[in-house]
Amino acid sequence: MSTTGELYLRIAQDGDRSIAVDQYHRGALRVFRPLYLDGTGQVAYYVVNPGGGYLDGDSYLTEVEVLQGASAVLTTQAATKIYRTPTRPVRQDTRASLAPGAVLELVPDQVIAYRGASYRQTTLVEMDPTATFMSLEVLTPGWAPDGSAFGYDCVRMRTEIRVGGRCAVVDNLRLVPGEAGMAGLGALEGHSHLASFTALDARIDAALVTEIGELLEVDGVRGAVTRVPGPGLIARALGDDTTRLTALMLDISELLRDRWFGAPRLDLRKY
């Protein structure tokens, strides 16, 4: 099946820093030149969609391979804006492979789903038991002409993570505003925005999960965290402000980056 845009990156360790030893892009996806945001040698790549938004039937494929001991952050230049999709949903597929000791952080800007939008996102991660994977997502409803809170049709986000060839996590998020009860108990519970943070690392234990749960205890936000096989964890937060939820997810990232790698808080320098 043809795609609107494709991106492939292969990251390896070269001395005291990580570099791309192979990269390819086609269509409506690009990457800026690599940046090194701190003194750890971790490489950061910014994915760019020159079109500025995702339209009816668009499909995108991103593949990232992180080789032994290498470390990378993949982010976006700006929010992922999903416009009206009258015939076919927008698809975003991400596939990642992590070798022994590899680190990958997926830190995109928020997904904004506008009125009439349908969006399907799948992420497949295959990782060595000694690797580290972290990702965050923030979903924001776009403005609707009639002022409705949820104008989009459907958002589906599915993440599957395999550790050492074994399926460790399947996280399937499905939001359909047209179905009764989406704003109620067990769904968004009166809030408009949703954030999620996923981490898999052999060092995750019950004490760390408890510590992250305490980070989520903030006014105006409903948050919780659960331990998953891997070992790993998934944190969710409901709120009404993109900036606040993103900062909260980055608080979790900061704790883990400092604890595991002695690395500072991510400063993606976009604005």
Swiss-Prot record:
<dbReference type="InterPro" id="IPR002669">
    <property type="entry name" value="UreD"/>
</dbReference>
<comment type="subunit">
    <text>UreD, UreF and UreG form a complex that acts as a GTP-hydrolysis-dependent molecular chaperone, activating the urease apoprotein by helping to assemble the nickel containing metallocenter of UreC. The UreE protein probably delivers the nickel.</text>
</comment>
<keyword id="KW-0143">Chaperone</keyword>
<comment type="similarity">
    <text>Belongs to the UreD family.</text>
</comment>
<keyword id="KW-0963">Cytoplasm</keyword>
<dbReference type="Pfam" id="PF01774">
    <property type="entry name" value="UreD"/>
</dbReference>
<protein>
    <recommendedName>
        <fullName>Urease accessory protein UreD</fullName>
    </recommendedName>
</protein>
<dbReference type="GO" id="GO:0016151">
    <property type="term" value="F:nickel cation binding"/>
</dbReference>
<keyword id="KW-0996">Nickel insertion</keyword>
<dbReference type="GO" id="GO:0005737">
    <property type="term" value="C:cytoplasm"/>
</dbReference>
<comment type="function">
    <text>Required for maturation of urease via the functional incorporation of the urease nickel metallocenter.</text>
</comment>
